[in-house]
Design a protein with these regions (language model features):
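Cationic, low-complexity basic patches in intrinsically disordered or flexible, solvent-exposed regions
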Residues: 3-4, 14, 33
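N-terminal helical capping/dimerization or prosegment-like subdomains
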Residues: 35-133, 357, 361, 374
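Active-site metal-coordination/substrate-binding segment of hydrolases
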Residues: 114-186, 477
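Acidic, glycine-rich active-site loops and adjacent beta-strand->loop/helix elements
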Residues: 125-127, 185-194, 216-220, 244-246, ...
Length: 493
């Protein structure tokens, strides 16, 4: 059967709407499904061009953490400006920062409605280094399509997902269907912690004013289980130094008479979490909000096998705060972890010493409503309060960020939910993630608006690793989902 071209789909839509114009429910059904045919037809007709434009970005090694790629960062920013203008942006420019530049673009809808929403699309054009190169099965800077997946650095994170946003925008603008104002802000330092972003947001707060922020830089639960990320955990991180004697001592001459810094450190850290998995820092849970029952019910719908989870990481059982499931504990509840610990002699053979110093790096994953600076100070105070005599303890905060939760009853979330349902054929689950993206809380604190995380990654995509890839079927469905998001948000379904 010959594939319906775009003009043919438009004609079919007009004919069917004419036939069913007297039946509102039938009209809605026809409108919805013909619109889906039209966007998928457009994607198919322009697929080769889309892939080549995507490839033109991937071929630029925009590795933000390596000074040797400084010129590549600028080249990538310029290429994004070109692509945004070609897609229909009325303005696109490179804006400097203390680090790598930002790309800013905008589109103002031509409509008589003064109350149309303004969407700010955020992405990043920098990528992680590709090393170790010998583990790649193809050139990381030259896209290679194998078995329905595109392999390259940035295939997913985040050049591939950014292209989803831009191609959905292109379709709507080219066909007179974009009834939202749209602004784009692409940064070049996300992979190094976005050191310039907060300053940029504050300096250009008026320029970036919007009603909602849209980000595609997260993942779905699975290809058959679409989901919207509705929450991220915050982070607090410290280094602890414990100092005892002025030098490493002979454990036979001094053991039992002088406090061992490593013993002291492990004693203190062992007190931070009790046998029920509760964190014992005074006041730690004061700002922790309960998980809404509606969300707990949604979490139960997520396909999850405790046995398979344990087998995948080769442990006998899970552990955590009593009264919560594993999925609740690693996404909606705070946690404490010792990330590294060292001191004394760790070389070959044995050396009987009582070490003079001990160190640990520790972190807390926080949840929305917890302030990372407040928690950071509370932890430092607690450690000092339980420090034993005979050692000196220093707690140094490293970095941190706020958690984030997106309400699932706001219009923008409902629009995203609709987009996923149309594109993937089923209602997406609302799913919090255990990781942290500090920039999301920066958006809320500085710009005063919520963020919708419409991510289309999969665990299999191996972001940050050799052989990063993107499922092309999911990628195309992502374009459909974002297209439908805009239509739903502007009320033009």
């Amino acid at each position: 059967m010959r594939q319906l071209d775009y003009k043919g789909s438009v004609l079919l839509k007009s004919c069917l709407l004419g036939v069913f114009s007297c039946n509102s429910s039938a009209t809605f059904f026809i409108e919805k499904h013909i619109s889906l045919i039209m966007i998928r037809t457009y994607i198919a007709a322009n697929r080769d061009r889309f892939l080549e434009e995507w490839a033109s970005l991937i071929r630029i090694p925009s590795v933000s953490c390596q000074p040797a790629h400084k010129e590549d960062m600028l080249l990538c920013a310029k290429r994004w400006c070109e692509l945004l203008l070609e897609a229909g942006a009325q303005k696109a420019e490179i804006m400097p920062s203390k680090g790598h530049p930002f790309v800013y673009a905008e589109y103002t809808a031509s409509t008589q409605n003064d109350n149309i929403p303004t969407v700010l699309v955020y992405s990043h054009y920098d990528v992680m280094p590709v090393e170790p190169l010998d583990l790649w099965h193809s050139n990381p800077w030259e896209p290679d399509i194998r078995e329905g997946r595109l392999y390259a650095r940035g295939a997913d994170d985040d050049k591939g997902q950014a292209m989803i946003q831009v191609k959905a925008f292109e379709y709507l603008v080219k066909h007179g269907l974009m009834n939202c104002n749209v602004k784009f802000i692409f940064e070049g330092e996300e992979e190094i912690g976005s050191p310039s972003l907060d300053t940029f947001l504050k300096e250009h707060k008026e320029l970036l004013a919007c009603d909602i922020i849209l980000v595609s830089d997260t993942s779905m639960i699975g290809k058959e289980t679409p989901s919207i990320t509705t929450g991220l955990r915050g982070l607090a991180y410290w280094e602890i130094e414990v100092i005892g004697p002025n030098r490493d001592l002979h454990s036979g001459h001094f053991g039992g008479a002088v406090k061992n810094p490593i013993n002291a450190l492990t004693e203190m850290l062992a007190k931070v979490v009790d046998t029920d998995g509760r964190i014992t820092i005074p006041g730690f849970y004061d700002d922790v909000l309960p998980i809404p029952q509606e969300e707990r019910d949604m979490i139960k719908q997520i396909p999850f096998s405790e046995e398979a989870y344990c087998q995948a990481i080769d442990v006998d059982c899970t552990f955590g705060e009593a009264g919560y499931s594993t999925l609740e504990r690693n996404s909606c509840r705070p946690s404490f972890d010792i990330c590294g610990i060292w001191g004394g002699y760790t070389g070959e053979g044995s050396k009987t010493v009582l070490p003079s110093k001990a160190y640990a790096k520790v972190s807390c994953r926080l949840v929305a409503n917890q302030d990372h600076e407040k928690v950071s100070q509370a932890f430092a105070d607690y450690i000092q309060s339980i420090a034993p005599a005979g050692v000196r303890v220093t707690v140094t905060p490293m970095h941190g960020g706020q958690g984030y939760v997106c309400p699932i009853d706001i219009p923008a979330y409902k629009a995203a939910e609709h987009g996923f349902e149309v594109a993937f054929g089923k209602r997406p689950l609302a799913a919090r993630r255990g990781g942290s993206i500090p920039i999301i809380s920066s958006f809320e604190q500085i710009l005063g608006v919520k963020t919708i995380l419409m991510g289309f990654g999969l665990e299999k995509n191996a972001i940050h690793s050799p052989n990063e890839s993107m499922d092309l079927e999911v990628w195309e469905s992502g374009i459909v989902a974002v297209t439908e998001f805009y239509k739903a948000l502007s009320g033009t379904l």
